[in-house]
């Protein structure tokens, strides 16, 4: 781009999974709210969820070749340098075309190429672009660990995530950015509307069950298997079983229904309708559930590097949740542990306060402030450079 710039240009890099995309979009929204004329560009891949999520939020999506970083030595590791070079080359073109003032990276398949295109060694551009990194998980991925060493500011959701800046200092703790509808959430105020929306009774406890965008069979089996015990205790259930799964549950009570749906498009109303939830403990899920002060039973994914359990531990320590392993989540556990929990309003109130104390509702706004400050300084440097030509 040539000539004078009319607005700051912010590039967000966090494609691949919802756990990377949603924080990026939350920050993008906060940036636009603070400075509406800012130009936002999102980097993504053709196979990621960003192909639908980013345009739906009104932002420009630029596709680059993905660079999945293998956790174990495989043939993919041999192909990695070639893939990185191709992706960095394409990313450079995007950064040049939008005249980026700052890159905000959230990890994932597009983050490493963005970091290297901005500052990376022999791959360095004609000018450096400031980098802000945010690590949402309790255990950082490879891309953000590398990028943190190149970044202007390094931010994280929780202490001890493994991302350190160039001075080997730990990241600044800001929490996980959540969308405005969650940050400004009034669970009690929306309760009546939410329950009517889902066909749930206005009175009595409600258990929310969801296993991510695709559902989770272990959660489905355990909770549906305890349907009779839940109904006898007067507990209604709102259960998102996943679009690829089916769930047939006997209705044991007219006053405490079991509402099973493939997918929840209105998670804000689902949170408002519920008194507690059983769910996975991905970083974004924990952030949202904590931000709205919803007591939780977290069931970490049984595979991976254990980061989901780490994500939930601060909430458990604050008294806002309990953790159960995937193989221990059974109908017997639901009947023996979850039913008594939902039947104890004093305990739920205490757990709600504990969860809310851990939640960071202002993270997106705080990160946006940091990003805009860095972008403005870079923009001024570039304007001065143009004026001296």
Curated annotation (Swiss-Prot):
Binding-site residues, UDP-N-acetyl-alpha-D-glucosamine: 17-19, 137, 179, 213, 308
Membrane topology of this protein: Peripheral membrane protein
Domain of life the protein comes from: Bacteria
CDD domains recorded: GT28_MurG (cd03785)
InterPro entries: GlcNAc_MurG, Glyco_trans_28_C, GlycoTrans_28_N
Key word Glycoprotein present: no
The protein's Enzyme Commission number: 2.4.1.227
Function: Cell wall formation. Catalyzes the transfer of a GlcNAc subunit on undecaprenyl-pyrophosphoryl-MurNAc-pentapeptide (lipid intermediate I) to form undecaprenyl-pyrophosphoryl-MurNAc-(pentapeptide)GlcNAc (lipid intermediate II).
Alphabetical list of PANTHER family matching this protein: GLYCOSYLTRANSFERASE (PTHR21015:SF22), UDP-N-ACETYLGLUCOSAMINE--N-ACETYLMURAMYL-(PENTAPEPTIDE) PYROPHOSPHORYL-UNDECAPRENOL N-ACETYLGLUCOSAMINE TRANSFERASE 1 (PTHR21015)
UniProt xrefs under NCBIfam families: murG (TIGR01133)
Protein name listed in UniProt: UDP-N-acetylglucosamine--N-acetylmuramyl-(pentapeptide) pyrophosphoryl-undecaprenol N-acetylglucosamine transferase
Protein species of origin: Rhodococcus erythropolis (strain PR4 / NBRC 100887)
Underlying gene: murG
């Amino acid at each position: 781009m040539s000539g004078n710039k009319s607005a700051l240009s912010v590039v967000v890099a966090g494609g691949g999974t919802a756990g990377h995309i949603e924080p990026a979009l939350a920050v993008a929204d906060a940036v636009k709210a603070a400075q509406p004329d800012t130009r936002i560009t999102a980097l993504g891949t053709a196979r990621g969820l960003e192909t639908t999520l980013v345009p739906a939020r009104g932002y420009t999506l630029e596709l680059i070749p993905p660079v999945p970083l293998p956790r174990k030595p495989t043939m993919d590791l041999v192909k990695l340098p070639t893939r990185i070079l191709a992706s960095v080359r394409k990313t450079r073109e995007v950064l040049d075309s939008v005249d980026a003032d700052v890159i905000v990276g959230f990890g994932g398949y597009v983050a490493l190429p963005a970091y290297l295109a901005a500052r990376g060694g022999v791959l360095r551009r004609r000018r450096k672009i400031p980098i802000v990194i945010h690590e949402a998980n309790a255990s950082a991925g490879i891309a953000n660990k590398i990028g943190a060493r190149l970044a202007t500011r390094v931010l994280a959701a929780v202490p001890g995530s493994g991302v350190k800046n160039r001075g080997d200092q730990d990241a600044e703790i800001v929490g996980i950015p959540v969308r405005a509808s969650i940050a400004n959430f009034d669970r009690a105020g929306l309760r009546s509307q939410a329950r009517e929306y889902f066909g749930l009774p206005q009175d009595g406890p409600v258990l929310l069950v969801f296993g991510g965008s695709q559902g989770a069979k272990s959660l489905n089996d355990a909770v549906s298997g305890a349907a009779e015990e839940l109904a006898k205790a007067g507990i209604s259930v709102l259960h998102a079983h996943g679009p690829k799964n089916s769930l047939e549950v006997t209705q044991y009570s007219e006053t405490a229904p079991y509402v099973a749906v493939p997918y929840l498009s209105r998670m804000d109303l689902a949170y408002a309708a519920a008194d507690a939830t059983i769910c996975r403990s991905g970083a974004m899920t924990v952030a949202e559930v904590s931000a709205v002060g919803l007591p939780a039973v977290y069931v970490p994914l049984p595979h991976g590097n254990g980061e989901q359990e780490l994500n939930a531990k601060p909430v458990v320590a604050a008294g806002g949740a309990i953790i159960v392993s995937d193989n221990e989540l059974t109908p017997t556990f639901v009947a023996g542990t979850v039913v008594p929990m939902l039947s104890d309003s004093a305990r739920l109130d205490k757990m709600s306060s504990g969860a809310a104390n851990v939640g960071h509702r202002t993270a997106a706004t705080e990160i946006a402030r940091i990003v805009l400050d860095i972008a403005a300084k870079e923009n001024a440097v570039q304007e001065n450079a143009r004026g001296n030509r």
